[in-house]
Amino acid sequence: MSDEITILPTTVIGSYPRPKWLRETIRLHRAGKVNQEDLEEAFNDAVVTVVRDHQEAGIDVPTDGEMRRDEMVEFFAERLSGFKFYGHVRVWGDHYYRKPSVTGKIKYNNPMLLDEVNFAKSVSYTQNLKVTITGPYTISEWSYNEYYKTQRDMAFDLAKVINQEIKNLVDIGIKVIQVDEPAIHTRKEDVEWAIDSINESIKGVNVKVVLHVCYGEYSYLEPHLDKLKVDQINLALKNYNYTPVKLFKKWDREIGVGVIDVHNRKIESVEEVAEDLRKLLEYFKPEMVWVNPDCGLKLLPRKIALQKLINMVKGTLIVREELKKKGYTNTTLKPLINR
C-alpha cells in the first residue's frame, strides 16, 4: 500500500443505509424464519452493495457501511464482558435503542471486528479501507453504570479493551482507524479526562487515527485540542453552516471537513460543495484537509445518500484540480504523530 493519497481525500464517516432487503432479512431472522447462515450471507451481500456504491461515488477511503451494527454502542457492548441489556430506551422521536448497563468489570473476550473487516477487505476496490470503532467516552456516556465507582473508571477500562481491538485491526493491515466520539462534548467538566481516555485507547497505535466528533458544543473541546494524540479531527460542519471552523484555526494536524448535511434530504449541488471547500481552505492547509459528510448516512434513503456522495466527490474534484494547478498533488496516509 502506498503511503500517499491524492490531495483532498474523500471519505465517509462510517454508517450507510441498509438495503431494504437486508432490513427484511434481519426482521425475518428475529422472527425465527431465517437462519444465522443466511443472515450472514445477507450481511456480506450488503457490504458488497455498500462498497459498490462507494466505488460508484468515487470515495477514496471507504468503509463497509457498518452493515452489521444496529447501533454504535450496542454492537460493542454485546461483545464485551461486563454489560447487560434490560430493554429499549427512547433516544429521540420514535427512535429507540437497547441501552446497555455495566454490571461487572469490562473485559475483552475475542476480536469484535476482524471477520467483518477481513470480508470488507476482500471485496473492496481499494486497500485504503477505514474501520470505525466507538470511543470509550461515548460508550461510557451512553451506558448505565451499575458497577464502577465513577464514569471515568468505566471509560478507562473501555479504553484498554478498545486498544486491544484496534491493535488487532492494525495487525491485519488496516491503515486508517476512526474513533467515534459524538458524546465527548456532553459536559464541559468531562472533556479533559475524556480526551485522556481516548489517548489511552490509541496508545501504541502506529497507523493514522481519526477522531470523529459531531453535533455538540465544540467550544468545550477547543481548549484541550493540544492534548489529543490523533492525526485527524473529523467534524460535522455543514449542519452548522461552518460556524465552528474558527475554533479549530490553531489545529495544525489533519481536519476532516463535513460538507454534506446528513439530516437534510436536500442534495447538495456539486458547485455548492466546491464553493464550501474553497472557503474552508482559507482556514486550513490543503494537504491537511479531508472531505466527508457531517456524520453517518444510515438514516437517509439509500438513493439520496448515494447522490450526496456523488456530488461531494464531484465538487471535491473541481477544487482538487484547482489545487493541482498550484502545485499540490498528494498527501500522506502515514500517522502524523507518535503515540
Swiss-Prot record:
Domain of life: Archaea
Example GO molecular function: zinc ion binding
Enzyme class: transferase
CDD domains linked to this entry: CIMS_C_terminal_like (cd03311)
Assigned EC number: 2.1.1.-
Cofactor entry: Zn(2+)
Coiled coil: none
PANTHER family (alphabetical): 5-METHYLTETRAHYDROPTEROYLTRIGLUTAMATE--HOMOCYSTEINE METHYLTRANSFERASE
Name of the protein described by the UniProt record: Methionine synthase
Origin species: Sulfolobus acidocaldarius (strain ATCC 33909 / DSM 639 / JCM 8929 / NBRC 15157 / NCIMB 11770)
